[in-house]
Every structure is written in structure tokens, then in C-alpha cells.
């Protein structure tokens, strides 16, 4: 398994296993099977509500903590103890301590050893700078090995300089053959920020494959030429760009 060396020297497996929308009754078996197939990077988040289940599954499978890389994310949803509806209220003025509490909750959920490998700001919410500042604090305490962002554009990343001297280790965002994101990829790589692809084969909040990619005539013709599946061709395209999958 190839590793990507992040800008602080931490090694991150290039191939990861996403845990979003895995049914609860199939979750543990899916995690164990993924591990047996060779996956060593697992991606979760507070809003997936499976952080505890992820650690439990890996422990039950007799996996050693040092043998896996775990990513989680802090999301605006975590700042409320009641259902959160997007656009329901202005959220710029969330207290900083509330954000710290949300991060602490994820750290407790993933308490296995004394660290989380990678912690991302899940989206550039109005309070994203407070979120990153809080992650900076936990990173410097040694409780997080690397911090980063998700779905951030250059202006968001540049703004982080106001609250932290830590350049994000990773920016996770949608990349696909129909949304190549060449400019954003170049920006991140020029800044030493590793790029991680998400939503390459499925739309947000859906497990259904994107037929416009799977059945794309150009991708299919390349797949036929090399006797591979369209999925394999797309994964190879990402892999050769040094993108985390």
C-alpha cells in the first residue's frame, strides 16, 4: 500500500475506506472485510454517527492501533444538541468553547491509543476559522497527528493564516473525470497540501453510482483498451496524480 507523506512528515495510506452511509447492521463486517482486503486508512466523521462503531469493529478484529490511519471531521451539526437544519439560524457566533467540546467528543469516541491521525474541518462553515483554531490547539497538544480541511477553496485556506501557523495537511474535496478540479489541485499541491478525492463515483448522500461516469463512453473505451473496469481506470487516474483516494 502506497503512503503519502503529509507536510508535517506523517504518512497517510493513499487508499482509504469511507464509512458514510454504511448500514448499522453491516458496519462491523464491512470494516473487517475492508481491513482484510488491505485497507489501512478509514474515514469517519461526527455526523456519520459511527466513530465509536469504527473503533469497536477494528478492536474486535484484533487490529493494532498503529496499523491503521483514522480520519474524522468536525461539522456544524456537532455544535447543537438538538436537530440542526441548514440555514435555520446564523451560526457565526458559536462560542469557541462549544467547538472545542465538539472536537473533544470525537476524540473521546475514537479513544484508542492517545491520538487521532487526521482531523478535518468538514466544510467551510461560517465558523470554520474557529474550528481550525481549535484543531490547531489539539494538534499542538499532540492529540491529533495532522489537521486539514474539506471542500475548501483558496480564499478559505488563505484566511486560516489569521488563526493558525499550521498549513492544512490535507484538503478533501470532490474530484471526478467530470469535475477534474485542476486549478484547486495545483493550488493545494503548490502549498504542500495533500489532495484527497471524495464523491468520485456517487453523489452526496447517495450510494448509487454515477452512471454518467460508470457509463461514460470515453472512460469505457479506455477500460476496454486496457481490459479494466471503468472504476479501475478512474482510480488509476487519481492514483497517478498522487491524490489520496
Regions flagged by a language model, labelled:
Residues 1-68, 72, 78, 201-205:
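N-terminal binding-site loop/beta-alpha segment at the start of enzyme catalytic domains
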Residues 79-93:
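Surface-exposed, active-site-proximal loop segments in enzymatic domains
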Residues 107, 123-245:
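Beta/alpha (TIM)-barrel catalytic core signal, keyed to glycine-rich beta->alpha loops juxtaposed to Asp/Glu
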Residues 11, 38-41, 64, 111-115, ...:
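Short loop/turn motifs at secondary-structure junctions
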Residues 17, 34, 42, 54, ...:
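Conserved, mostly hydrophobic/aromatic
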Residues 66-80, 118-122, 151:
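A short, structured active-site edge motif that brings together acidic residues
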Amino acid at each position: 500500500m502506497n503512503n503519502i507523506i503529509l507536510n508535517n512528515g506523517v504518512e497517510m495510506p493513499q487508499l482509504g475506506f469511507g464509512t458514510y452511509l454504511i448500514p448499522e447492521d453491516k458496519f462491523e463486517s464491512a470494516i473487517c472485510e475492508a481491513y482484510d482486503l488491505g485497507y489501512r486508512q478509514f474515514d469517519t466523521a461526527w455526523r456519520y454517527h459511527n466513530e465509536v462503531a469504527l473503533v469497536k469493529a477494528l478492536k474486535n478484529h484484533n487490529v493494532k492501533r498503529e496499523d491503521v490511519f483514522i480520519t474524522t471531521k468536525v461539522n456544524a451539526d456537532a455544535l447543537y444538541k438538538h436537530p440542526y437544519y441548514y440555514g435555520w439560524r446564523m451560526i457565526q457566533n458559536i462560542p469557541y468553547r462549544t467547538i472545542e467540546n465538539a472536537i473533544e467528543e470525537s476524540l473521546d469516541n475514537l479513544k484508542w491509543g492517545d491520538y487521532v491521525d487526521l482531523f478535518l474541518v468538514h466544510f467551510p462553515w461560517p465558523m470554520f476559522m474557529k474550528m481550525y483554531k481549535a484543531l490547531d490547539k489539539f494538534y499542538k497538544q499532540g492529540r491529533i497527528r495532522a489537521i486539514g480541511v474539506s471542500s475548501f477553496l483558496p480564499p478559505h485556506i488563505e484566511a486560516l493564516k489569521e488563526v493558525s501557523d499550521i498549513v492544512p495537511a490535507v484538503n478533501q474535496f470532490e474530484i471526478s473525470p467530470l469535475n477534474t478540479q485542476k486549478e484547486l489541485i495545483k493550488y493545494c499541491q503548490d502549498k504542500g497540501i495533500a489532495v484527497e478525492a471524495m464523491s468520485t463515483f456517487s453523489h452526496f448522500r447517495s450510494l448509487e453510482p454515477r452512471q454518467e461516469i460508470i457509463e461514460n463512453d470515453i472512460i469505457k473505451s479506455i477500460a476496454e483498451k486496457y481490459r479494466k473496469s471503468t472504476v479501475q481506470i478512474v482510480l488509476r487516474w487519481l492514483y497517478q496524480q498522487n491524490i489520496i483516494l
